[in-house]
Amino acid sequence: MDKHRKLIRLQNFDYSSSGAYFVTICTKNRKPFFGEIIGNKMILNRIGDAACDYWQETPKHFSNIDTDEFIVMPNHIHGIVIIEPQHADVGTPYMVSLRKNRFGNNVKGSLSSIVQQYKSAITRWCGKNGFHTFKWQSRFYDHVIRTETDLKAIREYIVNNPMNWKADEYHG
């Protein structure tokens, strides 16, 4: 790993803590493996269908997560992951604590482990179905959702993403 790479995670943040997270997962070199935008609508191909199905199945593989709004785009996926409290917490479900994770971010049930398992599942599916050139970008982008206003704006961004494809930073 390049020690000079820009850190994209919040330092000393516990990414296994309950709250809502907006993630963007890109294909390697932003290659359009999932389909194409036609008439402001995302038209999924077989890999895109699998990516969509697997995203919807993700909560079945973790006892404390749910997914919210998401979209599979030609070369990336935007989605909201909600990590539920493991115990009886009092508070707003979309507010995220700033407690520190002393052991790093790749712990079971953390955002990184959820995304890694999702990416692995799609990669395995592609290999089994003859799509051997499929590859992910090695990392992913996240945003900690701290308020209901933030959540609403992100949901709107996700829903409108196909209509804004030509202006999207991920458009090739």
Regions found by a protein language model. Give the residues of each.
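Short catalytic/metal-binding and nucleic-acid-binding patches
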Residues: 1-172
